[in-house]
Amino acid sequence: MLSHADLLDTRLGMKDAAAELLVHREALKCRLGGTDSGHPGDLTSATETVEGTTLLPGEEISNGGSNPNGMQQVNAKDQEKQQQQNSNQTGGQQNQQKQKRHRTRFTPAQLNELERSFAKTHYPDIFMREELALRIGLTESRVQVWFQNRRAKWKKRKKTTNVFRAPGTLLPTHGLPQFPSAAAAAMGDSLCSFHANDTRWAAAGMPGVSQLQIPPSLGRQQAMAQSLSQCSLGAGPPPNNMGLSGSLSSNGSGLQSHLYQPTFPGMVPASLSGPTNVTGSPQLCSSPDSDMWRGTSIASLRRKALEHTVSMSFT
């Protein structure tokens, strides 16, 4: 067993150790700026706090882990780093979105080669596009885009030229048949070319016209009908069944006269007798070329209307 002296020495050693710890604690508090004075009974808590402190790399003992200001500084630094990273990411995305595609500028030699290939075919395959791209120093995608734009321009130009060149696109046809150029020229030259001094339709060939007596009130209508019939007769020689004839009777007298007596060979005078009507042939100007337009001729329709009014006035 230990003697009494040994126990006293041990106790004095423990006191010295406690005093050293208190001094060390006071020194720490002075460095940290604390104002609280320690108590001799807080040796264990002081040792635990001193031993439990964790120091960051590069920090002094004054910036121990028990300092809340140091923790706030670390958190602030982390937040700043995160904000910088987020700002860099958003800035990169905005730059990618705002980045414009490069516009290719073709040289005259490249355009000449592309136009030559376009003249050969409007739809080149991938092999032809790759060969052309290697030849003129472009990428295959650029060549493909150029051909697409060139085809669109060609189609637009073709559509506009067809609109201005087509004869039937600007003016409506209204259902009228298209005439050949030669037939149209002949018809335009010969239509309404009959004159009063023409010897083909001399008065000698119409013996019954001089004996025809028409009331004065119908002189104007008869003149208009005669002018229309002369205009239609001037288009060509009438066939054998086209002699316009009528039988006019006043108060049942049965007066008959031949209006147009044909004088050409092979033509038979046609006369239709009726009680009180004037009948005209509905197929006036029915030459082989006029069969296409006789139903739509405005002149023939007007002539028929005038003949109808004349016949109604006689009745």
Swiss-Prot record:
Any one GO BP annotation for this protein: forebrain neuron development
Cleavable signal peptide: none
Cytoplasm listed as a keyword: no
Family membership noted in the UniProt record: Belongs to the paired homeobox family. Bicoid subfamily.
GO molecular function: DNA binding; DNA-binding transcription factor activity, RNA polymerase II-specific
Cross-referenced CDD domains: homeodomain
This protein's GO CC annotations: nucleus
Subcellular location: Nucleus
Annotated region of DNA binding: 99-158
Motif window: OAR: 296-309
Upper taxonomic lineage: Eukaryota, Metazoa, Chordata, Craniata, Vertebrata
Chain's role: Involved in the specification of isotocin cells. Required for the specification of dopaminergic neurons in the developing hypothalamus and posterior tuberculum.
Keywords: Developmental protein, Differentiation, DNA-binding, Homeobox, Neurogenesis, Nucleus, Transcription, Transcription regulation
Amino acid composition bias (Low complexity), ranges on this chain: 72-97
Disordered, as annotated region: 33-105
Entry keyword Hydrolase: no
Family matches, as InterPro entries: HD (IPR001356), Homeobox_CS (IPR017970), Homeodomain-like_sf (IPR009057), HTH_motif (IPR000047), OAR_dom (IPR003654), OTP_Homeobox (IPR051895)
Pfam families the record matches: Homeodomain (PF00046), OAR (PF03826)
Protein's name according to its UniProt entry: Homeobox protein orthopedia B
Highest taxon above the source species: Eukaryota
Native species: Danio rerio
Gene name of the record: otpb
Reported tissue expression: Isoform 1 and isoform 2 are expressed in brain and testis.
